[in-house]
């Protein structure tokens, strides 16, 4: 058993299942029937969804929510989030955006804050709408643009390309009268954003994209925030721009409520005037923390719509491991097994990176990975099976060398809080 130095957010598997090929064909089409696309996505197995980042969703959502809900609920939300990203991305870009024309369509969102945004813009200092890669975030700027509010949307390079293709394909669409998109991974885009705000314009940003000129992994202009006990280093450049120009910031998210697309509007953070020095720094830090508090609280009831959750590990900080002495962990483990108990993975802490039988496990808090040898399939299965688990009888049936290796691995996991010890029909975390 060995540690894996790092994990990759997206899995590139050698063999792609037929269901994935079929879904990929549908997702590349503007003419596919929405009901068929949705049904095909729901029918994907967890192994199929591993090709679309399910492993990362599981790890990241478990790190955030594992102390707030049962592991089974988190795994369900991770699956929903992976499907939501595929479904809502296709539905917007291939079914909605590609069919717009000269007549603005009715708004897709309920409780769209048109009057609130107009009121902020009337102050003459511009305005920023801060949202997240969550739910119907794409509908917020397009609905506002169709309502006659000129809006600029900063995007990463790939997302920018999606909108630019749509604009070139249907330049006559009413959307483009008030909707402008810029790539903030290029200097011209960032400059255009600053000029737009300086002139009193409106900007909408999905701030958890956490990208800029240095890309999503760059270290420039970052603040450390706490989300449900997990720290993350997030971009603050747009908030600093708001402080510089005195632009108020209104947080808005759009999620599903009783089957409807509904906006939720949160209190405005208003610098009141252009700020400099310590005043600007204090405003930026307070506002960034407040915005990510909004995201964290929203995830408690809408994590299944967080399409950005598969990239959270790029900007969250690993938690330190409270590791007890190996001898203490070994004694506790031996005590439970000697009394006919069993040991299994604590799935709120350590989980397989894919479905049963996977040989790699990850500590969702520290992001430390463990790899089992290819011939340890039975061991991997037992670790994940609460009904069987690892027992003294199973260990005693192993050869001497293999038993020693397995035992040490179990003791290490126990010392790092990665095992649950079951005995006398009770459960205790080790």
Language-model segments: what does each one mean?
Residues 1-55, 62-65, 301-314, 321-357, ...:
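N-terminal targeting/anchoring "stem" of glycan-biosynthesis enzymes
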Residues 2-131, 136-137, 141-142, 166-172, ...:
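Membrane-anchoring hydrophobic helices of lipid-metabolizing enzymes
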Residues 100-104, 173-181, 219-227:
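Short, basic, glycine/proline-bearing loop/turn elements
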Residues 142-149:
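Short, surface-exposed basic-aromatic patches at helix termini and helix-loop junctions that form
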Residues 152-160:
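Short internal beta-strands
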Residues 178-190:
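Active-site glycine- and acidic-residue-rich loops that bind
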Residues 189-359, 365, 374, 411:
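Non-catalytic C-terminal accessory region of glycerolipid acyltransferases
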Residues 371-430:
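Long, charge-rich, low-complexity alpha-helical segments
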């Amino acid at each position: 058993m060995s540690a894996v130095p790092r994990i990759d957010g997206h899995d590139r598997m050698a063999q792609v299942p037929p269901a994935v090929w079929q879904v990929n064909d549908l997702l590349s089409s503007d003419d596919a029937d929405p009901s068929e696309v949705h049904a095909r996505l729901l029918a994907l197995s967890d192994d199929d969804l591993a090709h679309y980042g399910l492993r990362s969703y599981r790890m990241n959502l478990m790190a955030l929510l594992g102390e707030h809900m049962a592991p089974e609920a988190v795994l369900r939300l991770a699956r929903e989030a992976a499907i939501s990203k595929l479904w809502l991305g296709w539905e917007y870009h291939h079914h909605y955006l590609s069919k717009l024309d000269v007549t603005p369509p009715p708004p897709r969102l309920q409780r769209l804050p048109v009057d609130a945004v107009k009121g902020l813009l009337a102050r003459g200092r511009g305005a920023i709408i801060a949202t997240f890669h969550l739910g119907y975030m794409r509908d917020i700027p397009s609905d506002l643009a169709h309502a006659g509010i000129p809006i600029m949307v900063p995007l990463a390079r790939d997302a920018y390309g999606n909108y630019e293709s749509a604009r070139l394909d249907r330049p006559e669409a009413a959307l483009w009268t008030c909707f402008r998109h810029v790539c903030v991974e290029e200097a011209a885009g960032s400059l255009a954003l600053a000029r737009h705000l300086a002139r009193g314009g409106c900007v909408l940003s999905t701030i958890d994209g956490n990208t800029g000129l240095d890309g999503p992994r760059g270290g420039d202009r970052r603040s450390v925030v706490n989300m449900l006990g997990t720290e993350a280093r997030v971009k603050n450049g747009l908030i600093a721009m708001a402080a510089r120009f005195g632009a108020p910031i209104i947080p808005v998210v759009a999620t599903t409520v009783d089957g409807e697309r509904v906006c939720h509007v949160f209190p405005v953070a208003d610098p009141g005037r252009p700020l400099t020095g310590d005043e600007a720094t204090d405003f930026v830090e307070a506002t960034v923390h407040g915005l990510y508090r909004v995201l964290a609280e929203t995830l408690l009831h809408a994590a299944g719509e967080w399409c950005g959750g598969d990239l959270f590990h790029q900007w969250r900080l690993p938690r330190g491991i409270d590791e007890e002495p190996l001898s203490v962990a070994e004694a506790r483990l031996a005590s439970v097994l000697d009394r006919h108990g069993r040991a299994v993975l604590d799935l709120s802490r350590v989980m397989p990176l894919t479905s049963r039988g996977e040989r790699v496990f990850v500590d969702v808090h520290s992001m430390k990975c463990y790899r089992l040898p290819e011939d340890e399939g039975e061991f991997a299965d037992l670790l994940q099976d609460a009904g069987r688990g690892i027992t003294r009888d199973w260990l005693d049936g192993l050869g001497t060398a293999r038993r020693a290796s397995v035992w040490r691995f179990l003791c290490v996991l126990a010392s790092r809080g990665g095992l649950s010890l079951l005995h006398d029909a009770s459960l205790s975390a080790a």
